[in-house]
Curated annotation (Swiss-Prot):
Role description: Involved in transcription antitermination. Required for transcription of ribosomal RNA (rRNA) genes. Binds specifically to the boxA antiterminator sequence of the ribosomal RNA (rrn) operons.
UniProt-recorded name of the protein: Transcription antitermination protein NusB
Subunit structure: Homodimer.
Matches recorded under InterPro entries: NusB-like_sf, NusB_fam, NusB_RsmB_TIM44
Lineage: superkingdom: Bacteria
SUPFAM superfamilies assigned to the protein according to its UniProt record, in alphabetical order: NusB-like (SSF48013)
Length: 156
């Protein structure tokens, strides 16, 4: 068994999810395929750490809901198109919008703060403010989207 452990903490898990989404886009495959490849590699080579479960959940979730997530981001871009954004910003926004819609255990302000921090660490000087603005607009509609999804699932 390997002495290497998966990355601890959600910040690092989110950062890794952003990297996986970036890799998937560059390779022209889904993030879920990247997760599957990484899981198989970690299984075959014990010295390679497994992905953090949250990283895998986010990447798979973004893959599963990609069209809806991209539509929601696009609807809140002003003066930009999704394909014109830096690839890292796209990945950060996709992870964050997935969390806003599907990670009920993560408070919305935490999602936005984490996204801004990732933009500071990984992207351009203008990206943190841009990411904050887009997510601020998306947050205005997420309660209605979550309620509609719950109603479709037949929940209360």
């Amino acid at each position: 068994m390997s002495d290497r452990k998966p990355v601890r903490g959600r910040h690092q898990a989110r950062k890794r999810a952003v990297a996986l989404l970036f890799e998937a886009e560059v390779r022209g495959i889904s993030a879920a395929e990247v997760v599957d490849t990484r899981a198989a590699l970690a299984e075959a080579k014990p010295d390679i750490a497994r992905l953090h479960p949250y990283t895998a959940a986010v990447a798979r979730g973004v893959s599963e809901h990609a069209a809806h997530i991209d539509d929601l981001i696009t609807a809140h871009l002003r003066g930009w198109t999704l394909d014109r954004l830096p690839a890292v910003d796209r990945a950060i926004l996709r992870v964050s919008v997935w969390e806003l819609l599907h990670a009920a255990d993560v408070p919305e302000p935490v999602v936005v703060d984490e996204a801004v921090q990732l933009a500071k660490e990984l992207s351009t000087d203008d990206s943190p403010g841009f990411v904050n603005g887009v997510l601020g607009q998306v947050m205005l509609v997420t309660p209605q989207l979550r309620a509609a999804a719950q109603a479709v699932r037949g929940g209360a």
